[in-house]
Amino acid sequence: MNKDDDKEGMAMFSALIEGIKPIAQDKRHFRTPLKTKQEIELKEQQLHANSYFSDTYQPLLPVQGPMRWLDEGVDSLELKRLRRGDYQPDLLLDLHGYRQSEAKLELAALIQACVKQQSQCCCVMHGYGTGILKQQVPMWLVQHPMVKAFHQAPKEWGGDAALLVLIDIGDQPHRR
């Protein structure tokens, strides 16, 4: 094709559609598409994560020794059981490579999954070193109402790069 054919074709097309007006759409009303189950669950997780976890809250946590915390009203024997590895985590969460905002959502989803699946213990792997997640994860866990206790994990579950978390699943028989 050359330029003369293009110009001629455009002129013919323009002549054909010269008096045509667009039709106004007044008969069909299109509904907004329904949200998928995944989108709804993600929105709920974000809502829960934002309502439970604050980055400005600074709880009193141990500076030296293993990272540990016990909620008020929980028997101190539970913390000892976590330390010894008596509880086997049913769910594991590896936060390596996550940003802080993503890790917060994943942590909220893990706790929600534990409650839903009646899992009393889970393991959160935040990594070695002095990274931001290693500092933030314990602070977030302290703020969640379903967390009864946490302790630095035994060697077989990650040692000082992980935390074993005890979740309050209600009046269910305790599993170890």
Swiss-Prot record:
The keyword Secreted does not apply. Its EC number is 3.1.-.-. Residues 93-168 form the Smr domain. InterPro entries: Smr_dom (IPR002625), Smr_dom_sf (IPR036063), SmrB-like (IPR022990). The keyword Nuclease applies. It is an enzyme of class 3 (hydrolase). GO terms for biological process: rescue of stalled ribosome. Keywords: Endonuclease, Hydrolase, Nuclease, RNA-binding, rRNA-binding. Pfam families: Smr. GO terms for molecular function: RNA endonuclease activity; rRNA binding. It comes from the Bacteria. Acts as a ribosome collision sensor. Detects stalled/collided disomes (pairs of ribosomes where the leading ribosome is stalled and a second ribosome has collided with it) and endonucleolytically cleaves mRNA at the 5' boundary of the stalled ribosome. Stalled/collided disomes form a new interface (primarily via the 30S subunits) that binds SmrB. Cleaved mRNA becomes available for tmRNA ligation, leading to ribosomal subunit dissociation and rescue of stalled ribosomes. Belongs to the SmrB family. Associates with collided ribosomes, but not with correctly translating polysomes. This is Ribosome rescue factor SmrB. It comes from Shewanella sp. (strain MR-4). The gene is smrB.
